[in-house]
Amino acid sequence: MDTILSKFRFTIKALPNNGHRPRELARTMPAHPLSYMELPYDPEYALYNSRLTPEALSTATDDEMYWAVRTNVIFRHTGELPIEICGPDAETLLNKMFTRNVTKVKPGRCSYQFACYHDGGMITDGVLLRLAEDRFWMAQADGDLFSWYKAHAEGLDVTIHDPNVWVSQVQGPKSLELLSEVIDDAKPEPFRYFDCADVSICLLYTSPSPRDRG
């Protein structure tokens, strides 16, 4: 790396638009709909799946955030990208895409999956959710899987699209305690490792100020 560049770090910052219309980059680097929660804490962002994902906040050091997720709980809005794959041949397509057997994943369950090139090189990984017998979401890490789905879907009865879903993660040993407090009904029981469930959450908008929203 150039010695001059090695003295700098590069980041993306949120700046007021001062009444000007958004620039083109505002549409190619969309922010999480709940990013307003982070704005009071001078966030720094990176580009992840062409989405903005927070890397740093002024209220916590890297070490403090690490120990929070190890010993307590954090709430984080990510750039992970869910893609929906549905239709009679959805399972067939996904078994062509991923190295682990999708047939074993039952509705209401998730599975860690990763996609590889034909020579074995890894494209990306993520969590596959089986929402129904013929409907899946793949919440992927950074990488281009959409084109790979399309390339392998020829001749199959399957639909591949972006459901316009954003991922927020509740992480840490106290994550289930927090979830029990925010969902409207009782936490699904049993709620096992890699289970998925559809629950409703009440959000209360109490103030026009981003600092005071709850």
Identify the residue ranges that each predicted region occupies.
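Single conserved hydrophobic/aromatic residue that forms the stacking wall/gate
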Residues: 205-214
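Glycine-centered loop/turn motifs
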Residues: 106-110, 145-146, 189-199
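Internal alpha/beta scaffold segment
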Residues: 136, 141-162, 187
